[in-house]
Amino acid sequence: METNSHFFYVLLCNDNSLYAGYTNDLQKRLKTHNEGKGAKYTRARRPVSLCHAESFETKREAMQAEYRFKQLTRKKKEQYIEEKRRSKEAVYVKTPDEF
Protein backbone atom coordinates (compact mmCIF):
# COMPACT_ATOMS: atom_id res chain seq x y z
CA MET A 1 0.00 0.00 0.00
CA GLU A 2 1.15 3.50 -0.68
CA THR A 3 2.85 5.31 2.16
CA ASN A 4 1.12 8.61 1.35
CA SER A 5 -2.37 7.10 1.61
CA HIS A 6 -4.75 7.94 4.40
CA PHE A 7 -7.15 5.30 5.65
CA PHE A 8 -10.46 5.17 7.44
CA TYR A 9 -10.71 1.71 8.96
CA VAL A 10 -13.11 -0.39 11.02
CA LEU A 11 -12.04 -3.09 13.45
CA LEU A 12 -14.14 -5.95 14.74
CA CYS A 13 -13.37 -6.35 18.44
CA ASN A 14 -13.41 -9.57 20.45
CA ASP A 15 -16.74 -8.57 22.06
CA ASN A 16 -18.27 -8.16 18.56
CA SER A 17 -18.27 -4.36 18.77
CA LEU A 18 -16.95 -2.17 15.97
CA TYR A 19 -14.18 0.40 16.34
CA ALA A 20 -13.55 3.06 13.68
CA GLY A 21 -10.35 5.00 13.26
CA TYR A 22 -7.88 6.81 11.01
CA THR A 23 -4.32 5.85 10.08
CA ASN A 24 -1.73 6.27 7.36
CA ASP A 25 -0.34 2.73 7.92
CA LEU A 26 -2.97 -0.01 8.25
CA GLN A 27 -0.68 -2.92 9.10
CA LYS A 28 1.21 -0.98 11.76
CA ARG A 29 -1.99 0.36 13.31
CA LEU A 30 -3.63 -3.08 13.48
CA LYS A 31 -0.51 -4.47 15.14
CA THR A 32 -0.52 -1.58 17.63
CA HIS A 33 -4.16 -2.24 18.54
CA ASN A 34 -3.48 -5.96 19.09
CA GLU A 35 -0.42 -5.23 21.24
CA GLY A 36 -2.63 -3.22 23.60
CA LYS A 37 -0.90 0.03 22.67
CA GLY A 38 -3.70 1.41 20.50
CA ALA A 39 -6.85 3.19 21.53
CA LYS A 40 -8.10 2.68 25.08
CA TYR A 41 -11.36 1.26 23.68
CA THR A 42 -9.63 -1.64 21.93
CA ARG A 43 -7.20 -2.52 24.75
CA ALA A 44 -9.85 -4.45 26.69
CA ARG A 45 -11.43 -5.89 23.55
CA ARG A 46 -8.50 -7.75 21.99
CA PRO A 47 -7.86 -9.40 19.72
CA VAL A 48 -9.22 -7.12 17.03
CA SER A 49 -9.41 -7.82 13.32
CA LEU A 50 -9.68 -5.51 10.36
CA CYS A 51 -13.13 -5.72 8.79
CA HIS A 52 -13.16 -2.62 6.57
CA ALA A 53 -10.75 -0.02 5.19
CA GLU A 54 -10.99 2.77 2.65
CA SER A 55 -8.14 4.78 1.16
CA PHE A 56 -8.27 8.56 0.71
CA GLU A 57 -5.90 11.11 -0.79
CA THR A 58 -6.02 13.41 2.22
CA LYS A 59 -6.13 13.02 5.98
CA ARG A 60 -9.13 15.34 6.09
CA GLU A 61 -11.19 13.11 3.75
CA ALA A 62 -10.35 9.99 5.75
CA MET A 63 -11.22 11.64 9.06
CA GLN A 64 -14.50 12.94 7.65
CA ALA A 65 -15.40 9.41 6.56
CA GLU A 66 -14.57 8.17 10.07
CA TYR A 67 -16.75 10.85 11.66
CA ARG A 68 -19.72 10.10 9.38
CA PHE A 69 -19.39 6.36 10.08
CA LYS A 70 -19.38 6.93 13.85
CA GLN A 71 -22.73 8.74 13.60
CA LEU A 72 -24.46 5.62 12.23
CA THR A 73 -26.32 2.94 14.18
CA ARG A 74 -24.83 -0.56 14.29
CA LYS A 75 -27.28 -1.76 11.64
CA LYS A 76 -26.44 1.17 9.34
CA LYS A 77 -22.71 0.55 9.89
CA GLU A 78 -23.12 -3.06 8.76
CA GLN A 79 -25.15 -1.89 5.74
CA TYR A 80 -22.45 0.66 4.88
CA ILE A 81 -19.72 -2.00 5.01
CA GLU A 82 -21.78 -4.38 2.88
CA GLU A 83 -22.56 -1.65 0.34
CA LYS A 84 -18.87 -0.76 0.01
CA ARG A 85 -17.99 -4.44 -0.35
CA ARG A 86 -20.46 -4.85 -3.20
CA SER A 87 -19.29 -1.69 -4.96
CA LYS A 88 -15.63 -2.65 -4.45
CA GLU A 89 -14.87 0.90 -3.25
CA ALA A 90 -13.10 -0.33 -0.14
CA VAL A 91 -9.48 -1.42 0.19
CA TYR A 92 -10.44 -4.28 2.50
CA VAL A 93 -13.82 -5.62 3.63
CA LYS A 94 -15.05 -8.62 5.57
CA THR A 95 -18.64 -9.56 4.85
CA PRO A 96 -21.14 -9.18 7.73
CA ASP A 97 -21.34 -12.99 7.83
CA GLU A 98 -17.65 -13.00 8.79
CA PHE A 99 -18.24 -10.66 11.75
From Swiss-Prot:
SUPFAM superfamilies xrefs: GIY-YIG endonuclease
Cysteines engaged in disulfide bonds, as pairs: none
Any one Pfam family match given in the protein's UniProt record, by short name: GIY-YIG
Domain GIY-YIG: 4-79
PANTHER family for the chain: UPF0213 PROTEIN YHBQ
Family: Belongs to the UPF0213 family.
Record protein name field: UPF0213 protein RBAM_000440
Source organism of the structure: Bacillus velezensis (strain DSM 23117 / BGSC 10A6 / LMG 26770 / FZB42) (Bacillus amyloliquefaciens subsp. plantarum)
